[in-house]
Amino acid sequence: MKHTRSTCPYCGVGCGVVIESQGQHITGVRGDPEHPANWGRLCTKGSTLALTASPHIQQQTRLLHPQMRTQRQGATQAISWEQALDVASQKLLDVMHRHGPDALGFYVSGQLLTEDYYVFNKLAKGLLGTNNIDTNSRLCMSSAVAGYKLTLGADAPPACYEDVDHAQCLFIVGSNTAWAHPVLFRRIEEAKAARPDLKMVVADPRRTETAGLADLFLPLQPGTDVALFHGLLHIMLWEGWTQPDFIAQHTSGFEALKTLVRDFTPDKVADICGLRKEDVFTAAQWFATSPATLSLYCQGLNQSTSGTAKNAALINLHLATGQIGKPGAGPFSLTGQPNAMGGREVGGMANLLSAHRDLANPKHRAEVAALWGVDHVPEQPGKTAVDMFEAAADGQIKALWIACTNPAQSMPHQSTVRRAMERAEWVVVQEAFASTATCAYADLLLPASTWGEKEGTVTNSERRISRVRAAIEPPGQARHDWYIAVQLAQRLEQHLRPGQPSLFQYSSAESVWLEHRESTRGRDLDITGLSYELLEQQGPQQWPFASGSTQGTARLYQDGVFPTPDGRAQFAAKPYVAVAEKREPKYPFSLNTGRLRDHWHGMSRTGVLGRLFGHVPEPVIQMHPQDMARRNFIEGSLVRVSSKRGSLVVPVQASAELGLSQTFMAMHWGSEYLSGQDAQGMPLGGVNALTSPEVCPSSHQPELKHAAIKVEAIDLPWSLMAMAWLPASSVWQVQSQLRPLMNRFDFASCVPFGRERTGLMLRAGHAHAPDAVLIDEIEQTLGLASNTALRYVDPQRGQRRCAQLDTSLDSNSSVLQGFLLAGDTQSAAWMSTMLTQQIPAQVPAQTFRRQ
């Protein structure tokens, strides 16, 4: 048994893991007891990592060799790496020569390692001469970046996880930490248990599990955070709870902010936010008068057209009360992805350069050009995520290179995103998993390595750099992301820099990291004192860690000096602006999207485990019970949900966690799991068919936390329910085969179930009984078409019932192996129970008679 220390590939907590492996198989995973981010703890996602890497799953879900399509929507053909890289470089050069470098677009990921990010950034900006490289971190963290830079001068969270243990007041806003950062939440729970006097305030439109631990819950209206923060500062000023000495010595711009918040009286704020003014007063008092206040925040602030203003307004509170630069205090942005921070460090966004340099700064461009050995870095701003896909949809960007992310699931306004990939002349998808929706749009698929196979580094929310180590070799012909980018770059150099030494002479991930390290010298994130060897010997470290240092830096700004031209933090007087898409009579509900506890992003990894669907088994939209009652919606009935951009059909579920006129749907449900067709027969996408592409003007982050929608009853009198246990060696192939069939119904969802075994559950609804051939295909695909199955068919009524029994375990009794009910699904509940609990089957005879 081999044991390899590495880092979890899920959220930004950055937990250490110990991977157990035998030969080329990962056999187990446990929390690393020595990693300071988690001290051995793991959440449900992290603790099941080894199961997602089982040989059966790898064979069915992974891209194992390069593949190319000769025509769109056609089958792929396996090709060699030499062929793949040759054709990729030729296509990029052709587009570049015909349309210029800005006709190229690179869309990368916060799940890439720092080394991967660095090479891609240098490839785009240094070699090809385009700043059109952005990342899915634009969807989660760019407002936090902009907020920190606007107020504190640098993209650097000033606090650390240990501050939870020192805080006297926790102010959690826009974060369901219990689900999105579970291991950190365990630390919060322990702090509350050890110190009952620790005050905890949670502000969130939903009464989440995190809110359940709060001493004070503020159920504010969606998008009103800036008004709340201005109102808190108004009260602090009125009551004399600010710190004038700190403001005078360490900040600037306070007078303009005082003028702005003068109008945000408790009455006005209570009205805007939908809160009790007494609760607003209490929150202000606890925040300001606590010896140490730590704020924790995430997508509720970031994913907004006011994202930068929200971040800045919260940081204003810390500056006004001196709650920064000391143990237990500070504005602490929780990173969404495992290496969104590392991507920011290397400048892997359209507006950034290496080591927190700004693309708009001529001095910074010159420094990076000198480091990379190029004449210049282009000054033309690059296209950010939403702009990039809109430009491709409009025909401006001709080639897209997508690495380690799934925009056909995760981007807002899916119709535009999919049109972009359809219209682009050339689409490359560099990906570990073959099952993502984006893979269907690729002209060229390049197999990449993933967790358990990669070497490099990541940086978590508290600026802590951890090593990622390989326990096994990548399967098939999969290659490391940085190496794929290097191989591409060297081919491009033969045409763009003939006869000159390569700019990409990297022999390992470490050699890439060393160049990145040098780029940080003298910068706010200086890591010139670090090395792979030091990280091996001393474990994960927090930056800055400059040359000559003996340890990292837990907290920033303890001396009151900030990385701004005058050394002072800057108050930001940003006005309150409502959500971009307000509710209106035609669209009377707010849609909020967010995470589930046991899933991650588009579920290309977590979605292969039936046990991770035990918490939330299938797609639903949640509504307040009173809103459902007014519309005569029944729990579990199908509704059509529509925004100005698209629609979907989904079951409705009552939730008292929500306020009136609010709805919630998990961000994970893409077209891989939730599908159907519209009135014109066009396929329906997942939840992001509904979401808004409107962005924050400063951060360019889209407002995924709010869209105006309508929810209507839909009459689909014909329904289908099918469930079947499937062999581990074929279950994911079966799911892939079912996906195109799902698009032939008005509504369909397909999800795995089971704990020790795995099966698939398919639900569908339609306006009329579909062609019997379609049901035959489903039966065949789920293994229910054998001669031994019990079966009843009534073609005139569009009804069918089928049950496959398994007697292999006990010849004297049988259990359900699978069933299909079409046209009449009244028996679904008890048959589902018999199947999932493996109760000895006693299927009533009338189930297979004409009713």
Regions found by a protein language model. Name each.
Residues 72-77, 239-277, 354-367, 372-376, ...:
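N-terminal leader/propeptide and maturation segments of large enzyme subunits in energy/redox metabolism
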Residues 170, 213-214, 264-267, 296-301, ...:
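Flexible glycine/proline-enriched surface loops and loop-helix/loop-strand junctions
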Residues 792-851:
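Flexible, glycine-rich terminal cap/loop adjacent to redox cofactors
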Residues 212-220, 447-449, 453, 464-475, ...:
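Short beta-alpha connecting loops at secondary-structure transitions
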Residues 105-113, 272-275, 298-305, 337, ...:
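Conserved short loop/turn motifs at secondary-structure junctions
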Residues 475, 481-538, 602, 606-622, ...:
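Long, contiguous, secondary-structure-rich segments that constitute the structural scaffold
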Residues 1-239, 250, 257, 268, ...:
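N-terminal export/assembly segments and adjacent metallocofactor-ligating motifs
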Residues 118-189, 196-203, 226-230, 318-440, ...:
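Extended redox/cofactor-interaction regions of prokaryotic respiratory oxidoreductases
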